[in-house]
Design a protein with these regions (language model features):
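N-terminal-biased segments
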Residues: 1-15, 41, 246-262
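Glycine-rich, acidic/polar active-site loops that bind/position phosphate-bearing ligands
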Residues: 123-309
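Histidine/acidic residue-rich metal-binding segments in metalloenzymes
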Residues: 3-97, 102-121
Length: 309
């Protein structure tokens, strides 16, 4: 890798990208909403949406999705293309409005909160998390603009794991500011919780994996002789990473760096075939989003099946 600095965040709609593409007054309004809360005006949202769409299309994107985290343990999404009805000359237009950026209306009946209700009764609404940057995901389906969102009901009840997190962060900030004021600081306006969510995982050769129904159906070993402690020779915590495992880690790092994930530390773990990836601490909701990206990218990586527990 010749230039990690240039690679890092290259698939993310960062503040630097917004500064380049948004009018100065719009950029300031967006940053204020990100740092201090509040809503964007419809006109501002339209400008941001157009800039985001233009950036995504220039990088090969054809669709966008509101990327959210329902009560299933993994992320969910629905893809919509940027195309609109052709004009009178039959020319296809690509558009993305502020309304489409800020809010979506997916069917929530298939999620745990849906119960036995019909699809038209179990509505769910996605709401843009402006503090978490949009990013581009590229795979066999193409290049998709992923917009991190919260997921709630018509009346505002949380239907996901992110909404309670955002509300908790706000509550912590409000109460922590009271303590900050006691120490004489009158300038601070916000206290931001941070998280460093390391991932420990097992790498199992595909041929061996397919022989174990417990791994296939449960994601863990349920039968067989207990493994020895190991670590007596060169397979310990600080042991040299095997070349095949190292190649996997290298590929993961490159993908994560493109998406702005600060993958920092990698090493063997205590159990046989166990390894770890740890990012740098980040703002709590960003760390949670990045953790989902880590799991998605890791599980999709080349001929190895990874189990995270």
């Amino acid at each position: 890798v010749k230039d990690v600095e240039a690679l890092f965040g290259s698939r993310v709609f960062t503040r630097a990208t917004m500064r380049e593409r948004l009018p100065k007054n719009v950029y300031k309004e967006v940053i204020k909403a990100m740092d201090c809360g509040g809503e964007l005006s419809p006109a501002t949202a339209d400008v941001v949406a157009k800039a985001m769409k233009d950036w995504a299309v220039e990088n090969g994107a054809t669709h966008y999705t509101h990327w959210f985290q329902p009560l299933t343990g993994i992320t969910a999404e629905k893809h919509d293309s940027f195309i609109t009805h052709p004009d009178v000359d039959g020319k296809m237009l690509m558009e993305f409005s502020g309304k489409e950026l800020i809010k979506g209306e997916p069917d929530a009946s298939s999620f745990p909160s849906g119960g036995l209700r019909a699809t038209f009764e179990a509505r769910g609404y996605t709401a843009w998390d402006i503090t978490s940057p949009a990013f581009l995901r590229e795979d066999a389906t193409g290049v998709i603009l992923c917009i991190p969102t919260a997921f709630c009901s018509y009346k505002g009840e949380a239907l996901d794991t992110k909404t309670p997190l955002l509300r908790s962060m706000e509550a912590i900030s409000q109460q922590a500011l009271r303590i900050v004021r006691l120490f004489g600081n009158t300038e601070a306006t916000r206290v931001i919780p941070s998280v460093g969510a390391e991932q420990e995982y097992f790498l199992v050769d595909r041929d061996n994996y397919l022989k174990r129904e417990d791994l296939i159906f449960a994601g863990r070993t349920l039968f067989g002789a207990p493994a020895p402690k190991g670590q007596e020779m060169d397979d310990h915590y600080f042991g040299t990473i095997r070349e095949r495992i190292g190649a996997y880690m290298k590929d993961i790092n490159l993908e994560l760096w493109k998406l702005g994930v600060t993958a920092k530390t990698q090493h063997n773990e205590a159990a046989p075939a166990q390894h770890e990836l740890a990012p740098i601490y980040d703002q709590a909701n960003l760390a949670v989003d990045n953790n989902q990206i880590v799991m998605e990218k890791s599980e999709a990586q080349a001929g190895l099946r990874k189990t995270m527990r």
